């Protein structure tokens, strides 16, 4: 049994901020009490705030670390992934669904990045050194004829927890017409 006691904390609950003590046992909150704890084995937060971690269900932040500028693919996946993890945990996010695009319309480098990003995710998770829990969200672009061929090799990835179907076809809610689509992509190069 692993137990951690946080005391003298401002605990953020769904209804209020209370001053008190929080006990975590085996990774789960087991009690929240008003007042300080007198236990010898405790962490005194000296009035600092303590809140549950946030869950991010969809972020494109990982792609920004692999493609920091248009047409630039970061050469090493693991350092890019750890940089992403540092930003995520610094934001208070303890569980993140890293969204990766499976398919694209314009060569923005996402296809080249896809396998590298999933490989880095698997490598980093296996080290046990990630500070947030990273799960995989594959966004399958239905209008890309390569989508199925890209998706199936990734479908048995242990971290895969969410799959969504996306339709960014011009005129289908993403752009009001083909002219808007052309304007958007003319600014990428």
Describe every region a protein language model picked out.
Residues 1-38:
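N-terminal metal-binding scaffold of metallo-dependent hydrolase/deaminase domains
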Residues 6, 24, 44-45, 56:
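Short, acidic, Ser/Thr-enriched surface-loop or helix-capping motifs
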Residues 48-116:
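Metal-associated gating/positioning segment near the N- to mid-region
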Residues 36-51:
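Active-site metal-binding motif and surrounding structural segment of the metallo-beta-lactamase
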Residues 103-107, 112-189:
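Metal-coordinating catalytic core of metallo-dependent amide/deamination hydrolases
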Residues 3, 40, 94, 161:
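Conserved acidic residues
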Residues 9, 27, 47, 58, ...:
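Divalent metal-coordination and catalytic microenvironments
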